[in-house]
Design a protein with these regions (language model features):
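Long, acidic (Asp/Glu-rich), low-complexity accessory segments flanking structured domains
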Residues: 2-194, 207-246, 310, 317, ...
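A cross-family signal for N-terminal binding/gating loops and helix N-caps
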Residues: 142, 203, 260
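Structural recognition of the beta-strand scaffold that forms the well-ordered cores
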Residues: 162-165, 197-201, 217, 252-256, ...
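Intrinsically disordered, low-complexity acidic segments that are enriched in bulky aromatics
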Residues: 221-275, 281, 288-289, 298
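Well-ordered, non-membrane alpha-helical segments in soluble/globular domains
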Residues: 230-240, 266-279, 363-377, 414-427
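A generic structural motif
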Residues: 254, 280-296, 397-398, 453, ...
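Structural alpha-beta junctions
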Residues: 272-288, 335, 383-390, 471-484
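Aromatic-lined glycan-binding groove of carbohydrate-active enzymes
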Residues: 299-409
Length: 488
């Protein structure tokens, strides 16, 4: 069977046109005693000077190089099947143009990871990222997000639940720990700097009967997050505050749950958080509603997966403290907290590695549900705040595990789930039918909701996070069409 022709999906807000196609032998190949790796490296070194090799290089290896001018326009959010077919061990060099500027990418990309398209002019206006899926000969292109400050592209009036938000499951479990306990590759600080905006935190009060004690030990189920000694919630909060000070356009959503083997109660946890942590309204959003982005820039938004002490239930005009997720549906494919503020996929009991396909199916189903939502956008902050409270969070946990099976520990699950979700987001998320316009409200804003991941950032691989963030593009385009200015 012949390999499929090249398909290009433009997931950016910018119209693109494929202008030229070049072919040359891949770096793995050698012919006529010529080191192709050396040649291709020299070719890619012409970042701002040339889009083609020099005459001597071309003469030296002419039989493995060809160039063709083409004109293939690709509108924002359009998927286009071309007649460009791969040929053996060749690399395809694709040059795109937008607004008179050209950008280039070689496929397959190194290590089959995302790559930033090379601008062919000084001071380029745009930055694009490409993800190439060799199995399908499929290239997805999206606007590169500034990972540390990506919320700066969105207006204050944006409903927080309308965003595509990457998150981590058991976020502080990056320390040396039991392999069934560890869920993350890198620190919370590094997670935040690379775009993570949802943190999943599990704690156990250290001295619950002492009102003056603030100690909250970070745990994962019955286990500490580190084998080298207790790690504390206070230190984690300080890291988040430092990040928000450096990036005031951002907000961090923090889900907090009581776990561990201690005898503390939910009510005691709620008292500790209220008395020792969340009193400062410039740092914390403690309302029991989903806010607009502008209400919480520079703040931590608390989702409460624990019960409140009776003394705190009268806060916020009787609605209580924090966004209510106390009635979290357990091990669910599609559940709703009784508060109505959160719709969640959190199926985590994978008895066998063969059940991972079921987990993947539940995850993509939740992505599809989130993509169909359409946010109500208003330039009036009061209206925006009220409308934001009506749109629930779609929360989608990609995590799962089985304590008793090593091939179902968090890292092994992530090895299988994460690449499939990258593939889904690039090829299928918020796809349109032939009768639908790519920017039509009938297909929704294309949001992912909050996607909660394990083991992102492994060996510097942030492709899953980048793909999630790319799905904010439709919302950004809708906001760009409105007259009000974006946040500074």
């Amino acid at each position: 069977m012949a390999p499929p022709a090249l398909t290009i999906r433009n997931l950016s807000t910018t119209p693109l046109e494929l202008k030229s196609l070049e072919r040359f032998e891949s770096a793995e190949g050698k012919a006529s005693g010529v080191n192709i790796t050396r040649i291709t490296r020299s070719l890619t070194g012409f970042m701002y000077l040339n889009s083609t090799p020099t005459s001597p290089q071309l003469a030296e290896k002419a039989e493995s190089f060809s160039r063709q001018d083409v004109s293939i326009p690709i509108a924002p959010f359009e998927t286009k099947v071309t007649d460009i077919e791969p040929q053996g061990n060749q690399v395809l060099r694709l040059t795109f143009e937008t607004n008179g500027e050209r950008y280039r990418i070689d496929t397959p990309t190194p290590l089959h990871r995302s790559t930033v398209l090379t601008p062919l002019s000084h001071n380029p206006t745009y930055e694009f990222t490409g993800v190439y899926l060799p199995k399908y000969h499929f290239l997805a292109i999206f606007s590169s997000a500034k990972l540390a400050s990506w919320m700066s592209n969105l207006k204050d009036e944006t409903p927080l639940a309308a965003l595509s938000i990457p998150g981590t499951h058991n976020s502080p479990t990056y320390h040396a720990a039991l392999p069934s306990v560890r869920c993350q590759a890198v620190s919370v600080k590094e997670q935040l700097n690379n775009g993570i905006r949802f943190l999943d935190i599990r704690v156990q009060p250290q001295d619950p009967n002492d009102p003056a004690a603030e100690g909250l030990i970070l745990v994962h189920s019955a286990f500490p997050v580190s084998l080298t000694g207790h790690k504390y919630f206070r230190d984690l909060v300080n890291h988040v505050k430092v990040f928000l000070d450096a990036n005031p356009t951002e907000t961090v959503i923090m889900s907090i749950k009581r776990e561990g083997i201690g005898k503390a109660t939910d009510q005691q946890l709620s008292q500790i958080l209220n008395h020792h942590y969340t009193q400062d309204s410039t740092r914390w959003f403690t309302g029991n509603r989903i806010p607009a982005l502008g209400e919480v820039r520079g703040k931590i938004v608390v989702i409460r997966r624990f019960g409140l002490d009776d003394s705190l239930k009268g806060e916020n005009n009787g609605t209580g403290l924090y966004i209510d997720a106390e009635s979290w549906p357990d091990n669910c494919a599609d559940g709703v907290c009784t508060s109505g503020e959160i719709r969640v996929q959190d199926f985590y009991e994978v008895a066998e590695s063969s059940n991972i396909e079921k987990k993947i199916g539940y995850s993509t189903d939740q992505l599809e549900r989130a993509a169909k939502t359409v946010a109500v956008l208003s330039e009036d902050m009061g209206v925006a705040s009220a409308e934001s409270a009506k749109q629930p969070f779609f929360m989608n946990f990609l995590s799962a595990s089985n304590f008793w099976r090593a091939n179902c520990w968090p890292d092994k699950i992530a090895e299988k789930v994460n690449p499939v979700i990258v593939d889904y987001l690039c090829r299928r998320h918020s796809e349109t039918t032939s009768s639908e316009q790519p920017d039509s409200a009938s297909v929704g804003d294309g949001s992912t909701g909050i996607v909660v991941c394990d083991w992102v950032g492994t060996d510097g691989d942030w492709d899953l996070v980048r793909c999630i963030l790319a799905m904010n593009a439709k919302l950004e385009l809708r906001e760009k069409d409105r007259p009000s200015d974006p946040p500074s």
